[in-house]
Amino acid sequence: MWDQRLVRLALLQHLRAFYGIKVKGVRGQCDRRRHETAATEIGGKIFGVPFNALPHSAVPEYGHIPSFLVDACTSLEDHIHTEGLFRKSGSVIRLKALKNKVDHGEGCLSSAPPCDIAGLLKQFFRELPEPILPADLHEALLKAQQLGTEEKNKATLLLSCLLADHTVHVLRYFFNFLRNVSLRSSENKMDSSNLAVIFAPNLLQTSEGHEKMSSNTEKKLRLQAAVVQTLIDYASDIGRVPDFILEKIPAMLGIDGLCATPSLEGFEEGEYETPGEYKRKRRQSVGDFVSGALNKFKPNRTPSITPQEERIAQLSESPVILTPNAKRTLPVDSSHGFSSKKRKSIKHNFNFELLPSNLFNSSSTPVSVHIDTSSEGSSQSSLSPVLIGGNHLITAGVPRRSKRIAGKKVCRVESGKAGCFSPKISHKEKVRRSLRLKFNLGKNGREVNGCSGVNRYESVGWRLANQQSLKNRIESVKTGLLFSPDVDEKLPKKGSEKISKSEETLLTPERLVGTNYRMSWTGPNNSSFQEVDANEASSMVENLEVENSLEPDIMVEKSPATSCELTPSNLNNKHNSNITSSPLSGDENNMTKETLVKVQKAFSESGSNLHALMNQRQSSVTNVGKVKLTEPSYLEDSPEENLFETNDLTIVESKEKYEHHTGKGEKCFSERDFSPLQTQTFNRETTIKCYSTQMKMEHEKDIHSNMPKDYLSKQEFSSDEEIKKQQSPKDKLNNKLKENENMMEGNLPKCAAHSKDEARSSFSQQSTCVVTNLSKPRPMRIAKQQSLETCEKTVSESSQMTEHRKVSDHIQWFNKLSLNEPNRIKVKSPLKFQRTPVRQSVRRINSLLEYSRQPTGHKLASLGDTASPLVKSVSCDGALSSCIESASKDSSVSCIKSGPKEQKSMSCEESNIGAISKSSMELPSKSFLKMRKHPDSVNASLRSTTVYKQKILSDGQVKVPLDDLTNHDIVKPVVNNNMGISSGINNRVLRRPSERGRAWYKGSPKHPIGKTQLLPTSKPVDL
């Protein structure tokens, strides 16, 4: 009487509600259609052929059954009393011969022994292409066996009703035969449990002995046997739908049982005006149609309860699925977010998951069902103005949504039930929209927008040509500030040009460094970002280049105005509070403070090239070497502190302007808008410079750190004046570079390369005076300076590392740092793996043994010698030359320490370079012989210098955020540990290995390795 799909849905709902059994992907009637094509291709074979391809015989009361099955069961009925029937196996040779005869169509079963026929019957089921009990139902059938006895039988029989009709006929016939066999169990010893154990692997086609027998396998086999036993015991009820399921269907459909139409097609026929809609509706499953009414029959559940699946239906916002007649009441564009493929997939889920919705919950009589569903469906899928104000992107789609809302309001008022649903919607503030609605690139969205789309696309082309104007706009859109609750009232008042999500994906340029993200949806939003966002895309865009050219002067003028008023502690607090309040909400404050400390730390570590760029006024800026070479006990009130203050104050000033002065004209707007942008741009540029100058800086540090302090104090004033003269043109040049970078993003690599060369050329002069301020300690300023430095370092580290919240931003930023940067490729040569010469390996083994013999003071001292890069020797001569170079460096240090009087007239740089060249010329004759004769005295003289180096360099390592250390010359303490201490001894071993030198190499017959002391396990040997 009822359509088979309706019956199946009612069965699935009942199984899920009463027994907790979910059935996924039941194919049902599709099996017959799938095998019909295969049936024509196969000839007269019997084994390994699907049921549809077999010859059938009509059996009264059972329908059409495969002829082989009928013949086999009829033959075995004559031998039903045979003991161990189906248990005893027949002869394998006879079975093969019998199978061949049957495949060739010979009727030989009547004369065959019963055990052979029984074995052939088992083989027939085992060789079916698909098990007669479909694999889709196996899990549900096994789950049903774990219920109580009565519930187990009912659930198993209900699951059998989900099978296709021809499968039901075959199962009913065969299990009825097996039941007759079990009724004669007193004679044949084969009751239903024994038969179930035998036939379960054949009917369910489990693996035959391939698995190891485990406890899980045994349990599974027992459950499978229980399934077959239940079907044997209740064979006559297989596939018979109970009456209480059939009685539910009229109530499910909301119609009278007496006037019920016999098919689903007749029920749906009059509902659609156009044939296209009717055809689409006929393709749709009745799952969404039926599921709501089935809630009435669930135990202990009232219709007012909204189940989880109903929420899913609401969130997906698809009126086509929510109600059968939503198409009639909603405007045409209501389903604009979904393609037909998406709709089909959702319908498929609704079909088999049977998601219960509240379509019929509010109806008291069956007649009012259609009115309720139309009104409720439209009200659920529509969004009230309160919702729009709270949660959705303000893009070009806003006018479209407002049109839809207006249309739906009219529909709801006409239905007469609008008042019932408005409080329900207003409580749901978080309606999650689907991705296709959010990023709608489809045809429907364009059609609804109408003529406004043309202007929008023209502006898209203009913006693509001038991408610079979109820097802050896309930044603020991406941060999520537009998601805040009160954006809608502000942005339309400002008359901003609206950008849809699809255009935004087209227009997104490379990310800026310091992009802020809004972490929470509930916290207070930043009004200043909204103001800038509203203004920027309109009239202010044309003034961009002028504002860019004006910006450096504005920044420099603002910074000294308030620098004297703020102590470092106030500065840090103010900076923290400003940055914390702008991008993050209240519950993220604890995270933000740690983040900002990291940001400031990375600022100080990335070097004063950043500061030289930012402050034109600070002509006496000292470079990175100052932070790195000076220890805390020697810090003083230097220009560096002013530098830190002005750097912070620029940001603080811009943020104050950003928040408080919103309407003071174009100059005010340029200050608010572009100073954070430039700060972020400097951050990126100085990171590149820091990479390029890292090797040069470390080399300079090695030279300067060994100078005596009294000599440096005498050179202090002259070198300071010299640097001030040389610094100012570089500052002007860097400011010009800064403006160029803001106006033209494409020139970034060029500017970075230019600034790198400048930094290299001027670094030798800058670093000469870096150590000059060591001799004037002032303890009162030390604490302030130290705390300021730590805050600066920690805060700036995280501004580059932790503010990128998206994976794509991480990848883009990382590629910008490591892969796509030509400057980094120039600095670092690729790794070359070569065969190590024998002598060099001997020298390394000797140096490691020598290292293990040193006292702890030597080991600590040698750890400081890590700044020089690892020298890769190509041959024996190359290794020798590298040793000579390292020895020359140390001998020059000793020369400087012994005789500073001779070098007083020189400047710092000239003295060091001259000393190195002179000592390298004299090395083979003097210092090398001295080292050969007196290695201990040389080591003793070098010990203090290496300790001093180690102290300084522990603070002086240049760390860059997001650094990729894969192809760097990685600084390793163990590799260079004997450069300063035992270089003379190594040279001696290389040139002329003596008897004592040969004795160092353990493992010879004279010196077996057992006598030596092994290296400590705590220190890994890195060769």
From Swiss-Prot:
Ranges annotated as spanning the membrane: none
Cell compartments where the protein resides: Nucleus
Modified residues (Phosphoserine): S285, S316, S318, S339, S340, S484, S582, S585, S638, S675, S847, S868
GO cellular component, one term: nucleus
Keywords: GTPase activation, Nucleus, Phosphoprotein
PANTHER family: RHO GTPASE ACTIVATING PROTEIN 11A, RHO GTPASE-ACTIVATING PROTEIN 11A
Name of the protein described by the UniProt record: Rho GTPase-activating protein 11A
Gene designation per UniProt: ARHGAP11A
